[in-house]
Each structure stands twice: as C-alpha cells, then as structure tokens.
C-alpha cells in the first residue's frame, strides 16, 4: 500500500518573494506597457552595451563550435557558459518584463538558435499550446509568456528578419502552419544591442537565411513564477546562483518551487 508523506517542506527563503505584485510605472513605461498589450511586441533600444555584444558573439561562437553542427539550444543556455548569465536579469529588459507580467517572474526558457545560410522560412506559429481569450478567465488568469530575442547580427532581407502579426496574440485561433505572407504582417529588422520582446502567443516566424553568413540569436523567455517552466533549473552554474545570487536571480531561476 502506498504510504502518504504528509510533510510539506518549504526549502527556500520566503524573503525572495516580492512584497508587491506590480511595480510602480512612470509615464514612459506605462506607454510602453500599453503598446505591448495592444500590439504584442516591443523593441527595446540599448538593451546591450557594445562590450556585451562582443562578449555574447564570442561566447555564442565558442559554444556552437563545441556542438559540432547543432543549430539549436532549446533550454539551459546558462549552463553552456557563465558568460550568458548576465542576460538572466538584464536591467533594461527585466524592467519591461516586470512592468508587463508583474514582479513575480521566472525564466520560462533560455535558448539560442543559429540559422545557417540556406535555412528556410519558418511556418507561422505560436509558442504556447494553451487556448486564448483576450479577456482571460473571470479571476484574471491568462497564459503569459514573453519572449526576448537578442539578435547578434543586423537582420536584413537576406539573412532573415522576424515576421509578426501585431495584435494577433488576442486571436482565438492558431495561425495556419504554412509559409505565406499575412497582409498585415510586420517585418522587424532587429539590430545588435536591441532586445525584441513579444508575447509568446503572437503569430510570428523567422524568415529564411539567404545570405552567406550565420544569423545568431539568444532567446530568454519569461513567465509568472507560478507557471511551469521548460528549464530544469539544475546544473552547477545555476545551482551556484540559486545558492548565492540575488533575490531576483533566485526568483528567476525557479527557487519558489512550491507554496
């Protein structure tokens, strides 16, 4: 007979839980939040310094060279090299993520993608499988995931920009998984140093790389702390940060694993 364990153990310091659900917003940030809520995306300028761009490019190249032909890292990016870690709580981005999702946030996934010359257009897709209602549930729940892309190469018509359909995060149906152009799509030509954040439920896709060079991106995605994460939050680098990092870093790395 199965023996029930009635003990409930909290194995984290409850001080890492924010005292307020939502941060105070100034007029500029409030305007950005309203834009994101309406259109489902936001372009953040000066999200990375020149030195950070150089460091990321060097680290990205070194990491994928070791992977020998692999073009995707789907999760646990921070475990591949500690030089990726500053993206975890990068201030210009976290400021906007908290403004939109509230203070109780964690990483949904930390990934990277190398699109080599000859890669094809992606089909249109959403990143989440949950159904959508723009009004949420009566209590206010809504599947909330925000993707943040740091593009390490200037996006052009040749190497493949990002295509989105602004406002489609509110659509009640998924997009057709096909390669075609929406009449109201928007093409984003991201620049190194910018961060492109977008709702995981917006219709989006990466276009094919017709250039002679690789296209490189790091993707750090966020959600509320009470949602399931793709990350394992294990491994030596993450374990060290969960032990000795800041309260925000611990929160972002899933330290509040039960309540």
Outline where the language-model segments fall.
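A structural signal for short, well-ordered beta-strand segments
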Residues: 109-112, 148-150, 218-222
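Active-site rim elements
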Residues: 81-84, 183-184, 205-207
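Short Ser/Thr-interspersed hydrophobic loop/turn segments at strand-loop and sheet-helix junctions
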Residues: 155, 201-202
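Catalytic core of non-heme Fe(II) oxygenases with the double-stranded beta-helix
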Residues: 119-190, 227-234
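Non-heme Fe(II)/2-oxoglutarate
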Residues: 2-21, 195, 202, 207-259
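Short hydrophobic-aromatic micro-motifs
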Residues: 43-44, 148, 196-198
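Short, conserved beta-strand/loop elements in beta-sheet-dominated catalytic cores
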Residues: 186-201
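Non-heme Fe(II)-dependent double-stranded beta-helix
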Residues: 1-39, 43-138
């Amino acid at each position: 007979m199965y023996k029930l364990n009635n003990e409930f153990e909290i194995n984290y310091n409850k001080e890492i839980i924010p005292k307020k659900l939502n941060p105070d917003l100034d007029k500029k940030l409030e305007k950005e939040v309203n834009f994101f809520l309406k259109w489902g995306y936001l372009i953040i300028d000066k999200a990375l310094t020149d030195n950070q761009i150089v460091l990321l490019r060097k680290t990205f190249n070194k990491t994928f060279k070791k992977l020998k032909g692999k073009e995707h890292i789907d999760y646990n990016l921070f475990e591949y090299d500690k030089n990726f870690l500053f993206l975890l709580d990068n201030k210009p981005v976290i400021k906007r993520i908290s403004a939109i999702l509230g203070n109780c946030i964690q990483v949904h996934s930390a990934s990277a993608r190398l699109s080599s010359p000859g890669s094809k257009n992606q089909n249109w897709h959403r990143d989440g499988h949950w159904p959508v209602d723009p009004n949420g549930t009566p209590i206010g729940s809504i599947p909330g995931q925000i993707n943040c892309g740091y593009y390490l190469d200037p996006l052009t018509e040749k190497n493949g920009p990002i295509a989105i359909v602004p406002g489609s995060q509110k659509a009640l149906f998924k997009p057709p998984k096909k390669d075609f152009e929406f009449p109201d799509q928007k093409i984003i030509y991201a620049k190194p140093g910018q961060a492109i954040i977008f709702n995981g439920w917006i219709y989006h896709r990466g276009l094919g790389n017709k250039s002679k060079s690789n296209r490189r991106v790091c993707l750090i995605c966020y959600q509320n702390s009470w949602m399931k994460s793709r990350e394992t939050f294990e491994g030596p680098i993450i374990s060290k940060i969960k032990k000795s990092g800041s309260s925000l870093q611990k929160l972002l790395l899933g330290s509040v694993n039960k309540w």
